[in-house]
Amino acid sequence: MRGAWLSRRAMVKAVLAAIGAFSVSWRRRALAAPVEITLPDRVPAETFTFEAKGIEGWTTVDGQWAVEEMAGAPSGKKVLVQRATKNEFNVIVAPPGPYTDVDVSMKFRPISGREDASGGIVFRFTDGKYYVVRANALEGNFRFYHYDRGRRQLASAGVKPPALGQWHSVRVVALGDHVQAWLDGMLYLDHRDTRFKSGRAGLWTKADSITAFDDLTIRGVGIGG
């Protein structure tokens, strides 16, 4: 009888310990969740839907970029498509800026690619140096890089690969050295880096990625602003 009572007592202790461990684990996860950073509401936005205007005034660093009509475009009938397949990276930079702090978002549709099927946001682009956040339909990761005559990964998060042929969204907010990035509305990357201070924003693909882009929105604080 005493043995049975001790057994029940041990079981109760085990259950309470498990509940306590779960509670501590949950609190740790809650505390670890990053606070989302934002630009002040007064910072204006410029959105590119490629309907009334093309890419006049944009800077093509590399790639074959053109505005095309596409069924199912998020806004209207036209999108910006990158079709070069033999470059290491393909970059186009929008006219606004340069900016220090930015909030940049876009929609992208990975159309095809055997080596890569990616879409990304370039920011703080100056003299060929930049940051980029990208998603790849062929890989289960969402990554943040800096580029300066080569690439170096700064941060990575495991994600469900964005589906080929479907529209997805990417957003980046950079305040000082603090960078956060979202894929399809979920915050995955939270990182700090002091390398690049300011520059313009744009779009990015890699290798043989054929990718469509739409609804590029840039909010930025100018140098000295």
Predicted regions and their residues:
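Extracellular glycan-recognition surfaces and repeat-rich motifs
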Residues: K53-V79, T85-E88
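N-terminal secretory signal peptides
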Residues: M1-A10, A14-V24, L31
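Secretory/extracellular carbohydrate-interaction modules
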Residues: A84-R143
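Extracellular carbohydrate-recognition regions
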Residues: P34-V61, G225
